[in-house]
Amino acid sequence: MENWYAEIITIGNEILSGKTINTNASHIARRILSLGYVVRRITTVMDDIEEISLVFKEAINRKPKLIISTGGLGPTYDDKTSEGLALALGVSFEINKDAYEMIVEKYKKRGLPLTEERVKMAKMPAGAAPVRNDEGIAPGIYILHKDIEILATPGVPREMENVLENFIKYHLKNRPNISYYENSFLLLGVMESTIAPYVKELVKKYNLYIKTHPRSKEMDKPELEVQVAGSSTDKEEITRIVNECINELKQIGTRLGGRVQEIM
């Protein structure tokens, strides 16, 4: 089965300082995982053109199928993603006609002038295409580079989510012929260290991703969320295998004195 690797880049000093929790990376990862991609790396860098350029270059050199960035597409001085991406690709940084028209229309509807800061959101790497942003002003940026699809999204979560969906619907050219499926349940009264050797054996048996997520302290009324996930070109087959593994884990948990609870 061909590897459909993806990388996620988050850009912003506010994330590195701990002021903002990086929920965008989590959303993007879950969404593209549902399409069949495997996220190999999530990287966060500061609002610096050289840093942004370097992280894009490094990602491109690893040759994933897809790179998605979030943050740094607004009108302020520290929104530098677009320029950093242009530098990484070795292309000019220029006003994109289609993006410019999108921005003109949005400000015109509001009766607002087109300032230098607002025009800045129309500047993109040469050869890029704007991705519609129905929740804000700055469009996303899509570019195909050496068979790698690259998307840059704004950092505001609702804008990122909207741009990501518009990208998937209207721009994404290649996607895996792979189905992803996961299921999970709660196991109460069994410590993670107790079930760990059984999990290790089932990973070998089923060739699936099995993860126990503690929801409480190990020694004090242990509670685990047990997650099982896998990918395959056959949707029905991977669903069957994951659920078979889930059932075996439930039986093991019960034998170990635990209580199974479904997640609603």
From Swiss-Prot:
Pfam families: MoCF_biosynth (PF00994). InterPro entries: CinA, CinA_Arc, MoaB/Mog-like_dom_sf, MoaB/Mog_dom. SUPFAM superfamilies: Molybdenum cofactor biosynthesis proteins (SSF53218). Coiled coil: none annotated. Belongs to the CinA family. This is Protein Saci_1508. The lineage of its organism: Archaea, Thermoproteota, Thermoprotei, Sulfolobales, Sulfolobaceae.
